[in-house]
Curated annotation (Swiss-Prot):
Pathways per UniProt: Metabolic intermediate metabolism; pimeloyl-CoA biosynthesis; pimeloyl-CoA from pimelate: step 1/1
Protein name from the UniProt record: 6-carboxyhexanoate--CoA ligase
Enzyme class of the recorded protein, top EC level: ligase
Stated family: Belongs to the BioW family.
Known function: Catalyzes the transformation of pimelate into pimeloyl-CoA with concomitant hydrolysis of ATP to AMP.
GO biological process: biotin biosynthetic process
NCBIfam families linked to this entry: bioW (TIGR01204), PRK01322.1 (NF002360)
Reaction catalysed by this enzyme: heptanedioate + ATP + CoA = 6-carboxyhexanoyl-CoA + AMP + diphosphate
GN (gene name): bioW
Length: 258
């Protein structure tokens, strides 16, 4: 079915040296594209890394590689926007949504106690809903979800239909959350950006879909969060491998939602 060759394109940028040398993370990006979109994609990732509000990078890496695994096409998670008047209200709602998705109050509390210490983690923290402990062994690196994308034309059609801003930030976040939630080990995801100018975050899961929350932190804060609450009784190593290596394209079909 899939005739065209696709490429995984990745960007990471940091300040005061590379990430491995202790540099401050500035920006990252993931795309999955056919070759004819390469130049435009690399240029847009370059622009993203150079113009980030977290600072001016002095290290950047952009790499691409051909994807040999078959690409799976999935639907985006259903989206709901929750308007809140403060980060406190937003965080209260986030905890409630996590609980509804199957994470116990005790485990949510254990995760929240450690969020500040994880703010420098570049990828995601994997947190087991049974033991209430972090179970990925990646330390400051975190688990980086890769090889997913949402072709622009299809995303713009979806955004128009649901009256959502056709912003690349929403496209990237929803593509990632849709990939993350599709595997058996996934229970729920809690995320907000490390961008000081962006305070909207989300909670996502198989049952509730993608729940945007308009304030999960104060403006000016560079502390981000990405926690995957997972069922540790499932095969966690396979889950991590799939998050990093399984290529996924989002393709919204209107009649799928009706």
């Amino acid at each position: 079915m899939q005739e065209e060759t696709f490429y995984s394109v990745r960007m990471r940028a940091s300040m005061n040296g590379s990430h491995e040398d202790g540099g401050k993370h500035i920006s990252g990006g993931e795309r999955l594209i056919p070759f004819h979109e390469m130049k435009r994609t690399v240029n847009s990732l370059l622009e993203k890394g150079l113009s980030h509000s977290r600072g001016k990078p002095d290290f950047m890496q952009i790499q691409f590689e051909e994807v040999h695994e078959p690409i799976k096409t999935i639907q985006p998670l259903p989206v709901r926007t929750n308007e809140v008047s403060s980060p406190e209200e937003g965080q209260k709602l986030a905890r409630l949504l996590l609980e509804r998705e199957g994470v116990s109050r005790e485990v949510i509390e254990k995760a929240y106690q450690q969020i500040i210490s994880w703010s420098g983690v570049r990828g995601a923290v994997l947190f087991d809903i049974h033991s209430g402990k972090r179970i990925d062994q990646t330390k400051g690196k975190g688990v980086r979800v890769s090889r997913m994308d949402w072709p622009d034309a299809n995303f713009e059609k979806w955004a128009l239909r649901y009256h959502v801003p056709a912003h690349s930030r929403i496209k990237e976040a929803l593509a990632l959350a849709s990939k993350v939630s599709r595997f058996p080990a996934a229970v729920a995801e809690l995320c907000w950006s490390d961008d000081p100018d962006y305070i909207t975050g989300y909670v996502a899961g198989k049952k509730m879909g993608y729940q945007r929350i308009t304030a999960l932190k104060e403006y000016g804060s560079e502390d981000g969060c990405r926690i995957f609450f997972i069922d540790g009784s499932e095969d966690v190593n396979t889950y991590i491998h799939d998050l990093e290596k399984q290529p996924i394209l989002i393709e919204w079909e209107e009649d799928h939602d009706s």
